[in-house]
Amino acid sequence: MDKIIIEGGQTRLEGEVVIEGAKNAVLPLLAASILPSKGKTILRNVPILSDVFTMNNVVRGLDIRVDFNEAANEITVDASGHILDEAPYEYVSQMRASIVVLGPILARNGHAKVSMPGGCTIGSRPINLHLKGLEAMGATITQKGGDITAQADRLQGAMIYMDFPSVGATQNLMMAATLADGVTTIENAAREPEIVDLAQFLNKMGARIRGAGTETLTITGVTSLHGVEHDVVQDRIEAGTFMVAAAMTSGNVLIRDAVWEHNRPLISKLMEMGVSVTEEEYGIRVQANTPKLKPVTVKTLPHPGFPTDMQAQFTALMAVVNGESTMVETVFENRFQHLEEMRRMGLQSEILRETAMIHGGRQLQGAPVMSTDLRASAALILTGIVAQGVTIVNNLVHLDRGYYQFHEKLAKLGATISRSSEV
């Protein structure tokens, strides 16, 4: 099993880091590539991540041709022939995001069968919003033996109100509605940048979607879609992770290709702490004098609130800031598991339901730790950089789902870090 080894203590991260295409954008784009019955789809700026390989295999399992040119960060999808309607269990079970193929398969074929998905263990994350929305559009849904089966000769436009602005459900329903008969309105829709990117992608294909980035989406169904070329939006969570890394280490880092507007909630909290964040021609520069930073209170919320996918990394920053900071996690339950591992490194914290109190500013010590999910992996590595001594981060299967060559990028910025596959 691979592990990351960090010699921490006095590292100051400096230099430039290039941000990859967004994992959370490319996965639904691959699902949407199921929809076109004409032409090929080409995705550029694709990150080389295990989740991308998994989604490629989910799509291939539908008898769709998928070619991944890793050297060019480019995927070509040809779904123009007959496609199957059952997604392969062995791949769907590995990744939560794979549920978003349900809507496209159903819209394209009139029938779909998808296994209950897997992924990080950070809460129950029910899929009822996906299923309720499809039922509102006329689908008959059955769940049996761990499988979800959906049937609809042709989906019908509907008015859908979502009890929570779920990103995955918004994506699934928006894709399904592109080929529905009539107009579909989704109220309380997710507003994340990845939703906007997906809507732009679908509109290029011939879909008619209005309101992406707002609470109300309006989709007028069409009879068919065609393949297109598209550049995947930059990964705001990877960008945010390196912003936090610079802030934790009194660093001076230019995060190339980072999009200011996509990272506004995080940038606001960094500035409140006393971090210097400036927009430059080629990206965002973060500079900090960590001992002078101030504690803050943060609450995770759906976009445009503070992203839950930055919660773990930001609590790592709170750990090195003098004073008591508070993190309130409102999106997922069970997402403070990394704090238990950070306590092995000397962190003092208390957790009461959805609130974590972080007593920061004490010198942390290196220790062997176990990553529990994707963003926790990054948080533990960043903590290892500032901790005195050697930190070993185990269970990197989560890290590889969302970060490409993370240790190499940190090493180029000055961290003493390596990856080992020794037992």
UniProtKB/Swiss-Prot annotation:
It is found in: Cytoplasm. The modification 2-(S-cysteinyl)pyruvic acid O-phosphothioketal is found at C120. The keyword Cell cycle applies. One of its GO terms (molecular function) is UDP-N-acetylglucosamine 1-carboxyvinyltransferase activity. It catalyses: phosphoenolpyruvate + UDP-N-acetyl-alpha-D-glucosamine = UDP-N-acetyl-3-O-(1-carboxyvinyl)-alpha-D-glucosamine + phosphate. The active site is at C120 (proton donor). Phosphoenolpyruvate binds at K23, N24. Belongs to the EPSP synthase family. MurA subfamily. PANTHER family: UDP-N-ACETYLGLUCOSAMINE 1-CARBOXYVINYLTRANSFERASE. Its main location: cytoplasm. GO terms for cellular component: cytoplasm. HAMAP family: MurA. The gene is murA1. Keywords: Cell cycle, Cell division, Cell shape, Cell wall biogenesis/degradation, Cytoplasm, Peptidoglycan synthesis, Pyruvate, Transferase. One of its GO terms (biological process) is regulation of cell shape. Its EC number is 2.5.1.7. It is an enzyme of class 2 (transferase). It holds the Pfam family EPSP_synthase. It comes from the Bacteria. UDP-N-acetyl-alpha-D-glucosamine binds at R96, D309, V331. Pathway: Cell wall biogenesis; peptidoglycan biosynthesis. This is UDP-N-acetylglucosamine 1-carboxyvinyltransferase 1. Gene3D superfamilies: Enolpyruvate transferase domain. It comes from Streptococcus pyogenes serotype M3 (strain ATCC BAA-595 / MGAS315).
